[in-house]
A protein has these predicted regions:
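Bacterial N-terminal signal peptides that target proteins for export
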Residues: 1-7
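N-terminal leader/targeting pre-sequences
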Residues: 6, 18-61, 66-169
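Bacterial N-terminal signal peptides
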Residues: 7-15
Length: 169
C-alpha cells in the first residue's frame, strides 16, 4: 500500500513544480474611460495568443500593438510610450530589418462596432526575460484609429490611440 501512496505523492510534487499556463485578462477603455471590451492573453509554445472581445469601436480595420509602459492615461494614452521593442528593431512586418516585438496584424471591427477574434504575437512572452510583457512592471495594449501599413516607422501610420489596456500579472 505504501508504493501507490509514494507514487501519488511523487506525481503531485512534480505537477506542483510545473508552472500553470500563464494567462491574463486585459480590460480596454476608450479615451472617455468607458470599457470597450477585454482581451485574454495566454502563453503559447512560441509567443502569446490573444482572444479579442471588443465592442463600441469604430467599424473598419484597426492596428493593435503592445506598448512599452503599463499606463493608459486618457485622453491620448501617450503615457503607454512607444511600441514594446526590446529587440531595438524598426516598425513593420514589411521592414527588411525586422519589426518591433509589439507589432501585430490588423483586426476588423464589424458594422456594429464589435470585434471577436484571435491574434498572436510570436515575439513576446508571458514568462521571464526581455521579451516578457510583464517585464518592468508590465506593458499596454493599444487599439489605433486606423490600420497599420506594416512599414512606416514608428507606428505604421495607424493614427490616434483610441483604446488602451494595461497588461500585468
Amino acid at each position: 500500500m505504501k508504493t501507490p501512496i509514494l507514487s501519488l505523492a511523487a506525481l503531485l510534487s512534480v505537477m506542483a513544480a510545473v508552472p500553470a499556463a500563464a494567462k491574463t485578462k486585459v480590460e480596454l477603455k476608450d479615451a472617455q474611460g468607458k470599457a470597450v471590451g477585454t482581451i485574454m492573453l495566454w502563453a503559447e509554445k512560441s509567443g502569446v495568443g490573444l482572444q479579442l472581445h471588443l465592442h463600441d469601436l469604430p467599424p473598419g480595420e484597426h492596428a493593435i500593438h503592445f506598448h512599452q509602459n503599463p499606463k493608459c492615461d486618457p485622453p491620448d494614452f501617450k503615457s503607454a510610450g512607444g511600441h514594446f521593442n526590446p529587440a531595438g528593431k524598426k516598425h513593420g512586418f514589411e521592414n527588411p530589418d525586422g519589426h518591433h516585438n509589439g507589432d501585430m496584424r490588423n483586426f476588423t471591427v464589424d458594422a456594429n462596432g464589435k470585434a471577436d477574434g484571435k491574434l498572436e504575437d510570436k515575439d513576446v512572452s508571458l514568462g521571464d526575460g526581455a521579451n516578457s510583457l510583464f517585464s518592468n512592471g508590465g506593458t499596454a495594449i493599444i487599439v489605433h484609429a486606423k490600420a497599420d501599413d506594416y512599414k512606416t516607422d514608428p507606428s505604421g501610420n495607424s493614427g490616434d490611440r483610441i483604446a488602451c489596456g494595461v497588461v500585468t500579472k
